[in-house]
């Protein structure tokens, strides 16, 4: 079962909700859970010395506990394998102007061609929700390797 970071941020800000959903997937036969730990903003859902931690999403505050560690602990108690997933080449949410390409690293953003504006930073293309990173940017590659 895949647990998306943004869609479940408020829900998983509470340990009892994590308990409920892990117990539920176990009861219907799942053996593995995949926890999204780096949504498209580039923030992470655990404490990191390399990436900013997502502590709020759409008004909901993160719980006062290590989200990822709790998923691992509870999942293992239930006999579930816990895996993580993260967005590697995305570091901004264009609908909310939020993320690393908006708060300090606009040079990391990829460029896109639009028929009406020509070549522009993807952060200016509001019909695309994810601000993709230029994979050739050496500074970003060093950053994401540290995050991994």
PLM features per residue range, with description:
Residues 16-43:
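Catalytic domains of carbohydrate-active enzymes, especially glycoside hydrolases
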Residues 1-3, 33-35, 82-84:
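Hydrophobic faces of well-ordered beta-strands that scaffold small-molecule active sites
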Residues 18, 64, 68, 141-144:
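Aromatic/hydrophobic pocket-lining residues that form the small-molecule binding cavity
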């Amino acid at each position: 079962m895949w647990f998306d970071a943004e869609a479940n941020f408020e829900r998983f800000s509470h340990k009892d909700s994590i308990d409920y959903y892990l117990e539920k997937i176990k009861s219907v036969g799942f053996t593995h859970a995949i926890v999204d730990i780096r949504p498209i903003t580039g923030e992470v859902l655990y404490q990191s010395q390399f990436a900013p931690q997502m502590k709020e999403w759409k008004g909901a505050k993160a719980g006062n506990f290590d989200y990822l560690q709790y998923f691992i602990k509870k999942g293992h108690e239930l006999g579930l394998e816990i895996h993580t997933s993260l967005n590697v080449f995305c570091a901004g949410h264009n609908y909310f102007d939020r993320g690393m390409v908006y708060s300090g690293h606009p040079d990391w953003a990829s460029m896109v061609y639009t028929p009406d504006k020509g070549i522009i930073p993807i952060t200016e293309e509001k019909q695309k929700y994810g601000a993709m990173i230029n994979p050739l940017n050496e500074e970003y590659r060093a950053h994401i390797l540290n995050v991994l």
